[in-house]
Amino acid sequence: MNQTYPTIRLKPGAQKRLMHGHPWAFSNEIAMDAAAKALEPGALVSIQTDNGEQLGVAIFNPHSLIAARLMSASPQAVIDRTALRERIAHARNMRDRLYDVPHYRLAHAEADGLPGVAIDRFDDVAVCQVNTAGMERLADDIAAAVMEETGVKNVILRGDSPIRRLEGLDDSSRVVGPGLTGAVDVIENGVVFRADPMSGQKTGWFFDQRDNRAFMAKLADGATVLDVYSHTGGFGLACAAAGAQHVTMVDR
């Protein structure tokens, strides 16, 4: 099924980065005519060169510096719940090959075809940070797709990232699902931690530090460890589990 979207055009020469794989077009690269300026933030658009060559489908925000974010290089792409589910399924399959337990960064924004969206999975809970107007309009479909593809019971849509303000979004958060209270377990490198997905920093846990925690743990056997600005205690507890003689964690 073909989908018709409003059209925006790039200024002459502005197509080079997009044609070489960059996923964004900045506001000063787009011919901001009256029709483009009138589009609602987050609208799906067909993006073209100045001479009408099709470059794909993007989400568009005329009020943002990053005005267009490419969703697909196919001009015929349909962006709906089915498309979102396919992208999340692909992301899940990739992560399940890397990790033996379902505790990981499920979606890495543009890298997984979800511009401005980060999703962390804590077994049957997922935390989703939606930082673009286009993805905000699809937030319920994203949550549904995550639940359908992973089987999680709750999806927390966190809206407290300051990046959202650049897109004209508010800071409200909500839970899709039966709800939850308090902390959740995080299993990483054989150690069970606790994280607060509702009000902890960002999604409640820094999965990008997994390898660094594992590296520090290798050095910890018999050592005295000081973990300053410990937050959830990820580094200190990893060292303790690896045989550190003494661990001091400091935060405020």
Listing of model-derived features with the role each one plays in the protein:
Residues 107-120, 136-206:
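Non-catalytic substrate-recognition/targeting regions of SAM-dependent transferases
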Residues 125-130:
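Carbohydrate-binding surface patches
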Residues 80-87, 134, 138-142:
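Short amphipathic alpha-helical segments
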Residues 178-252:
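Rossmann-like S-adenosyl-L-methionine
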Residues 1-122:
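Non-catalytic accessory regions of SAM-dependent methyltransferases
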Residues 40-43, 65, 151-152, 222-223, ...:
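Short coil/turn connectors at secondary-structure junctions
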